Amino acid sequence: MRTKQNYHLLTFHTTTAAMAMEDYCHEHGIPGRMIPLPQEISAGCGLAWRMRPEEYAQEKDRIEASKIQVENSMELML
């Protein structure tokens, strides 16, 4: 069994917003990946952008500059 790690998740109201964030992050070299929303969370479209908390801290301003609507932003052990 693998050890759980702390991650920062961004959730979205729509699949369109989730895919836009994935494209934006890839185009701008922002680390992370799209994952199915963990069962512990109930939110919008069922997808979340996952990244390490320290990466989110470094990239927060660029993510916010994307103007992509994020439903929730949280840290979670996965």
Task: Please annotate each region the language model reported.
Residues 1-4:
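Solvent-exposed alpha-helices and their adjacent loops that cap or buttress functional pockets
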Residues 6-8, 74:
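Short helix-onset patch at the extreme N-terminus, typifying the N->h transition
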Residues 9-58:
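Amphipathic, hydrophobic secondary-structure cores in small proteins
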Residues 53-78:
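C-terminal structural segments of small proteins and small subunits
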